[in-house]
Amino acid sequence: MERSALSFWVRSPGKGEIERVALPDPGPDDVVVRTLYSGISRGTESLVFEGRVPAGQRDLMRAPFQEGDFPGPVKYGYLNVGIVEEGASALVGRTVFCLYPHQTRYVVPASAVTPVPEDVPPGRAILAGTVETAVNALWDAAPLVGDRIAVVGAGMVGCSVAAVLAGLPGARVQLVDVDTSRAPVAEALGVGFAVPDDAEGDCDLVVHASASEAGLARSLELLAPEGEVLELSWYGDRRVAVPLGEHFHSRRLTVRGSQVGAVSPSRRSRRTHADRLALALRLLAAPAFDALITGEAGFTELPRLMPPLASGALPALCHRIVYDPVEEAALVQRHRP
C-alpha cells in the first residue's frame, strides 16, 4: 500500500498550496513520524514565502529537509513536533522534535529526531529550533554575571534570547521594540521592556534581532565604551547601512555576526548540533516560553494564513499549526489522483 501525506508548498512568491506527496518506505535506520504541531518561524519563512531569499544565499538558507529550490516551488520549514509511529523500538510512541517542514507525516533517519523531554509540552516544543538559535548566540556573546544587556527586536528570535538571558544572575536585561504590545511578553519572560527612545544605555552587550537599519543604529548607541553588538538579524536581499562614523572608533565598539548554521566557535570542539538542540529542548521546560506562541491555526489553513503573516497584517511571534489526523485522512483521499 502506498504511503502518502500532505505538505505545504510555496508554489511561487506569495502563493502557497497543500499537496499530496508519496512517502518512501522506511529503511532499517528510519522512523515514521506523525506530526502533531509545526511552527511558523515568521521572519525567515516570510522571506521564503515572498521569494526574497538572495540568489547568493540560497545554499546557506536551505532547510535540512527542504524540497525544491528558491524562489519556488519549495517545501520549507524546520519547527516540527510529532509522534514516532514506526522505527526503533526505543523511539516508537515517543514525542520528538525534527527540523522538518509543514507536513502531516514524514520518513527521516532516526538520527534526525530528538526526543522531547517529558516535562516539555509538545505544543511548546516547536520553539526548540528558535531557542537553539538563542543558545548559539549566547555561546557567541558569552555574557557575564551582572552584565547590562539590551535585546533590540522583540520578534521570535529576540524574545527567545531574552528568555534565556532572564536567568543570568545579577544581569539587567531589557527587551527593546517599537511595538508596545510586546511589553506583556517581556513581562512574562521576566525581563524589562522599552521602546527604542527610552531604552537604557551603557550596555556591555546588545543583541540585535530587529532586521532593521534603525534597530542596528540604536543598538550601537546603547553600548558602553568597548561594548559589543551581536547581530542576529537576517536581512534577506536588503542592503543595510551601518553607522560607523561619530563615536564608533573612539569608543572601540564591535559588531559581530552570529548564525545558527554552525556551532559557536567557543563550543565547537566540545558540543555537537545534537547537544545544542537537546539543551534547547531542556530549557523549554520553563512555562514562560508559552508567551512566544501568539496564534494557532489548523494545517489546512496555511495557504490563506501565510500571506497576512508574511506581510505583517497578522502580527505574530510564533504561529502554531495544529494537525488533525481525522482531517488529514479525509484530505488525503480528496487529493488522490
Feature names for model-found ranges:
Residues 199-206:
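A short acidic, Gly/Pro-enriched loop at the edge of an enzyme's catalytic core
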Residues 97-110:
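A structural motif shared across PLP-dependent enzymes of the aminotransferase-like
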Residues 142-143, 223-224, 313:
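A generic alpha-to-beta junction signature in SAM-dependent methyltransferases
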Residues 121-196:
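Mid-domain Rossmann-like dinucleotide-binding core that forms the NAD(H)/NADP(H) cofactor-binding site
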Residues 3, 271-337:
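C-terminal hydrophobic helical "lid"/dimerization subdomain
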